[in-house]
Amino acid sequence: MSDVDADEARKMAERERKKEEVRKRLEEASRMKKAKKGFLTPERKKKLRKLLMMKAAEDLKQQQMLKEQERQRILQERIIPLPDLDNEDDLEAVYDEIRERLIDLESENYDVSYIVRQKDFEINELTIAVNDLRGKFVKPTLKKVSKTEGKFDKLKKKEATKVDFRAQLKVVDKNEFALDEEDTEKKEKAAWAK
């Protein structure tokens, strides 16, 4: 019995030793895989992505804050604070001042928009000239047309027959509405025909 127990213990020890070897090989292989992946492991990638998103969100908030400050500054410049008005003369003076400012701003706006239109036209002309020199021409954008729409149009045309409204009218033999010129032409012959 001791031989059987010893033999069984030896087999168990052999199995344990083989399991340990397999475990070591798997650990070695996993270490090799990690070593091959390089510096950026999935955890590091996730952390880096999170940091980048936080930085981008912070930058976006900063930009929005700067834009809002710029907007407030410009509004403070442009908006004239209304004074306390005691009588009509003060009101007319404020009205005249605001009207003059409005006229100035509108004329500036018109001048700027005119310059922009001129520049756009010039840019377009130069683009056309460059394309002509290169030999490249701008292809016009085509509208998308569905195939089924054309088929439906053909079916509608076949179904819709021409309606002749004159056929429904009553025939009148009187020549009340006929022109008199036709009768005179028949009676009178041309000078050369005589």
Swiss-Prot record:
The keyword DNA-binding does not apply. It holds the Pfam family Troponin. Expression is detected only in pharyngeal muscle cells from embryos to adults. Residues 7-27 have a biased composition (Basic and acidic residues). It comes from the Eukaryota. PANTHER family: TROPONIN I, TROPONIN I 4. This is Troponin I 4. The lineage of its organism: Eukaryota, Metazoa, Ecdysozoa, Nematoda, Chromadorea.
